[in-house]
Amino acid sequence: MENKYSRLQISIHWLVFLLVIAAYCAMEFRGFFPRSDRPLINMIHVSCGISILVLMVVRLLLRLKYPTPPIIPKPKPMMTGLAHLGHLVIYLLFIALPVIGLVMMYNRGNPWFAFGLTMPYASEANFERVDSLKSWHETLANLGYFVIGLHAAAALAHHYFWKDNTLLRMMPRKRS
């Protein structure tokens, strides 16, 4: 068994990381841009979200298809259980967030854009649903900061404190 994830899994992991940064930055920094740029910034956010959704589903399918490389030295069962729980939360979060965002945008009942394309929208707006979905989307996005921070801290703890190969399994291979 390989001691690293596949190149595809590693590439998708880091691409999702970059897309999450872009999606978060689009929303956090949009106030620094003129209002006339908001549609473009929103389109970037939505396009990143759709890309994250697709890539997270692909990651999940790859994770089911390929065995997870072993952590060496093997951690205690409780640590393994916590890692599985953490990964479950990450997958659920970064699949649910884009789905909620897409359903929210659809229910606004007006044109919206992703990848430069006009996306389908409801013939009649449902603002009550939009408000509820927006609240969930924002709450989960804020939770995402904590989950990402915890994920990164755990990877660094594995590398520097427990001195195992957890972090190295997801790092790109060195060129020969």
UniProtKB/Swiss-Prot annotation:
Recorded catalytic activity of this chain's protein: a ubiquinol + 2 O2 = 2 superoxide + a ubiquinone + 2 H(+); a menaquinol + 2 O2 = 2 superoxide + a menaquinone + 2 H(+)
Membrane topology, as annotated: Multi-pass membrane protein
Domain of life, source organism: Bacteria
S-S bridge residues: none
Cofactor: heme b
SUPFAM superfamilies: Transmembrane di-heme cytochromes (SSF81342)
EC number: 1.10.3.17
Residues binding heme b 2: 45, 137
Regulation acting on activity, per entry: Quinone binding to the enzyme accelerates the reaction with superoxide.
UniProt keyword Transferase, yes or no: no
Transmembrane feature ranges: 8-29, 40-64, 78-103, 136-158
GO MF annotations, alphabetized: electron transfer activity; heme binding; metal ion binding; oxidoreductase activity
Cofactor-binding details, from the entry: Binds 2 heme b (iron-protoporphyrin IX) groups per molecule.
UniProt-annotated binding residues for heme b 1: 13, 151
General remark: The low-temperature difference spectrum of cytochrome b561 shows an alpha-absorption peak at 561 nm and a minor peak at 555 nm.
Reported function: B-type di-heme cytochrome. Catalyzes the oxidation of superoxide to molecular oxygen and transfers the extracted electrons to ubiquinone through the two hemes. Can also use menaquinone. The enzyme may be responsible for the detoxification of the superoxide anion produced in the membrane or at its surface. However, it can also efficiently catalyze the formation of superoxide from ubiquinol under physiological conditions.
Subunit-level organization: Monomer.
Family the entry assigns: Belongs to the cytochrome b561 family.
Protein name: Superoxide oxidase CybB
